[in-house]
Amino acid sequence: MPKAPKGKSAGREKKVIHPYSRKAAQITREAHKQEKKEKLKNEKALRLNLVGEKLQWFQNHLDPQKKRYSKKDACELIERYLNRFSSELEQIELHNSIRDRQGRRHCSRETVIKQTMERERQQFEGYGLEIPDILNASNLKTFREWDFDLKKLPNIKMRKICANDAIPKTCKRKTIITVDQDLGELELNDESSDSDEEMTAVA
């Protein structure tokens, strides 16, 4: 009887890869590379979603009558943004204050909110909080027309606004001059007191 034809894979056993071989190391590197790629992809998607939520809030709270915002107006809008969780925190505190409740409910959510508010407040009072460029009329118009598509985020111009931007430049200059004058007066007073002491010692 004729022998049954053997397939190409017939008789071939899958080789077992030694854990310390170069092939195993290559597979491990590829797996780590893929994991890192997926992690970066997820982090990027998360950042885009967070930016998208922020921009959506600002767009929903724009004054339809304004063609552009002043720095003072922008700072006032940012203050509203920084306090956007206030009502939710009040509700959480209310639930936690009710008797016969064991432990604090929504503790993790409360912690996340407070950390977010603290971080954004530090940015605003420090080097600045990044928001859509609503100070420029053309950029504001583009931002108003945004349809919440995250792929169109590069079309939206951003800029950093800090708390000091709400203070007019003239007020800042006056404050600096006043401080300089005070320092000058202190130096003069110190010099006069030193000369008085010297005269007393000579006498």
From Swiss-Prot:
Involved in the biogenesis of the 60S ribosomal subunit in the nucleus. PANTHER family: TRANSLATION MACHINERY-ASSOCIATED PROTEIN 16. Keywords: ADP-ribosylation, Nucleus, Ribosome biogenesis. Belongs to the TMA16 family. GO terms for molecular function: preribosome binding. GO terms for biological process: ribosomal large subunit biogenesis. It comes from the Eukaryota. This is Translation machinery-associated protein 16. Residues 29-39 have a biased composition (Basic and acidic residues). InterPro entries: Tma16, Tma16_sf. It holds the Pfam family Tma16. It is found in: Nucleus. Associates with pre-60S ribosomal particles.
